[in-house]
Amino acid sequence: MFFEILIGASAKAVKDFISHCYSRLKSIYYSFKRWLMEISGQFKAHDAFVNMCFGHMADIEDFEAELAEEFAEREDEVEEARSLLKLLVAQKSKSGVTEAWTDFFTKSRGGVYAPLSCEPTRQELEVKSEKLERLLEEQHQFEVRAAKKYIKEKGRGFINCWNDLRSRLRLVKDVKDEAKDNARAAAKIGAEMFAPVDVQDLYSFTEVKKVETGLMKEVVKEKNGEEEKHLEPIMEEVRSIKDTAEARDAASTWITETVKLKNATLNADELSLATIARYVENVGDKFKLDIASKTYLKQVASMSVPIPTNKDIKLKMVLQSPEARARRERMDVLDSVGFLEGLCTASGFESPFPILGLPEIAVTDGARLRKVSSNIRYLSQTHLGLVYKAPNASLHNALVAVERRVFTVGKGDKAIYPPRPEHDIFTDTMDYFQKSIIEEVGYCKTYPAQLLANSYSAGKRAMYHKAIASLKTVPYHQKDANVQAFLKKEKHWMTKDIAPRLICPRSKRYNIILGTRLKFNEKKIMHAIDSVFGSPTVLSGYDNFKQGRIIAKKWQKFACPVAIGVDASRFDQHVSEQALKWEHGIYNGIFGDSEMALALEHQITNNIKMFVEDKMLRFKVRGHRMSGDINTSMGNKLIMCGMMHAYLKKLGVEAELCNNGDDCVIITDRANEKLFDGMYDHFLQYGFNMVTEKPVYELEQLEFCQSKPVSINGKYRMVRRPDSIGKDSTTLLSMLNQSDVKSYMSAVAQCGLVLNAGVPILESFYKCLYRSSGYKKVSEEFIKNVISYGTDERLQGRRTYNETPITNHSRMSYWESFGVDPKIQQIVERYYDGLTVSAQLQSVKVTTPHLQSILLSIPENHSQNEY
């Protein structure tokens, strides 16, 4: 009974057990061998286990194989000579001849003829006897030589009374013979597995026909110098399977292999059948197959895909064989799987862009030496193999950031400056929008400075209280508007060349002037934008649940909708002096405050200094958005929405806008799609490089703020892309011990569960993190410190996780959005459900996780960061 437990154990556990018994418990070792012989041949699954055990017991080395071959040859010769002598003696004595002859015939393998009735001479007996003695002497000499070889290679204790030389060499020979048999069987299976599959190309068994769509078009033809108009039916090309038995057989093979190529784990359950049907539908739409062909392919695939072929069964047998498992375990040990799990560290990066050497930037020595390196930490088991890094706070990165993020827009060695807007274009085309916002907002009060200070966390709060006291004694002056910039320490997905970004804050004294007016009135101003557009437009004020419902409602307004994403490359850099003045006109129109008007005027000309390493950088720029200003987010939304409203008004189209600053999506009717081809040239007049992304015609394919709509239990919700798993597995925070790591995992998990309840894959990932943290409790302040600003926006204060079942409908919707089919979703979820994420701090730099991004259909060049 005890030995039977080993059948289900790992190969490593079995090998360790055998080694321990052989060295210390010989009686158990021999009992185990007898038990193996008893179960051998009774059950095929047990035979594989028996072979694996005997392989571990043998532990054969190369030198033994040569000795075993020679020993087998010599032993055969001795046995043949002995049996022949025995036969001759029997014939001489005329007793036991039949038995002796049978023994001789067997030992000589039937290769030597010896008559039954003959009487050998004494001389013949002596010759055969001498030959046997000579062979025995040679065998003895061989055994002496073999014993010395064993002593040299394996030490004196290896050959002993429990493991004599002859038994060992016979075992080696048997194992080698079995290995040869296995090699022949493997070659046979390999030939079957790697035989080419005869799959014809789709075009060989289908044909294209033109069919009438039922619609008519007006055709103008010239006849006798006059134009004649008449209606003709609109034709459409469709593809169908040829009406022959050969074509249908070829189509059956083709669709079966095509679906299996997409997903080889499909079986006969409800979800698999739905997945098969969707794959067939997608293939049919791609190749424009007619409904009859689609129906036939669906029927074939539903029957053939879930039934494994003999090749599928053999493939699974090979993959799950004891030898294959043992080899994988050995590789796991060599890869240190289990030993390198935990929180790893990656060093910061240096931007690959060259220094342009712009004269506008002055670099001086003498500053206090500052830290350069910027490490990032990541969970080795869940980062999906996605490489995230943070920029080093180096002089090179600082110069690249200033040159490429403030002054120039090119990616090469030449200085290419941002486009300038046409004269007075903002006031000429967007004056009406400015006035509409002012009217919609109405009166806004100025809030107490103490309230502004108390809205920040402890560290900033003290600095704001100090600034408030300072303003009481020294009035605001222009120097308060000077900017002290620094490199933004953020996670960059390293899929392309990156220029680090800058944060450009002004003094706390300056922020109090603007913050007491603008910060607490921002929502009111954003709702005014919604009122001008006639529907919710600025979606940053809504959580991902409400965002999804709003976007779905916008989509459903159109009979044949299309979504056009708008990519505003480096928006802050393109905000010109003219754009800033237009934005400031809204604030001044609302508040009519001279102190705020003066502070806003100081945003036009920016004096900036920056400390990095032991250097100080100074530069001056007119216009441009300073990313640390109180009005950065709100101002970008006002400018973008104003330009978009004017553009839609100019086109005269009905459209819906989804905006979150520089991130925009336009939803309109497909008939209007071509009207937006001139968007780049239009926005170039305003000084912006605006590029339209590829239009999408399915709601689930609409991407907004790195999220897509997914129908969860019948209600649309904005769900982050699967690569967010890799991003949430990295942190810029310092981690000193395992308790810090568990706190980080708990904070990320709690927020992730709120956003992703009922979402395939993501819910399991965050449950895995939360479980691995030991369900650790963390403070609200720590949660805000861990999660990014974007995640906090999506939450909108939510902290309660409402458990939601994952339905088949939700799985199909997630598939439409992210390309991960329902069966793959379940496989990934099972992986996370069985995973415990280690909180051990590791010193290694890079490890390859078990679950990688390719399984989640994450493209290698799909980055969250713009250049």
Curated annotation (Swiss-Prot):
Belongs to the luteoviruses RNA polymerase family. Its EC number is 2.7.7.48. PROSITE patterns: RDRP_SSRNA_POS. One of its GO terms (molecular function) is RNA-directed RNA polymerase activity. It comes from the Viruses. It catalyses: RNA(n) + a ribonucleoside 5'-triphosphate = RNA(n+1) + diphosphate. Residues 561-676 form the RdRp catalytic domain. The keyword Manganese does not apply. The keyword Protein biosynthesis does not apply. This is Putative RNA-directed RNA polymerase. Gene3D superfamilies: 3.30.70.270. Pfam families: Luteo_P1-P2, RdRP_3. One of its GO terms (biological process) is viral RNA genome replication. Probable polymerase. Keywords: Nucleotide-binding, Nucleotidyltransferase, RNA-directed RNA polymerase, Transferase, Viral RNA replication.
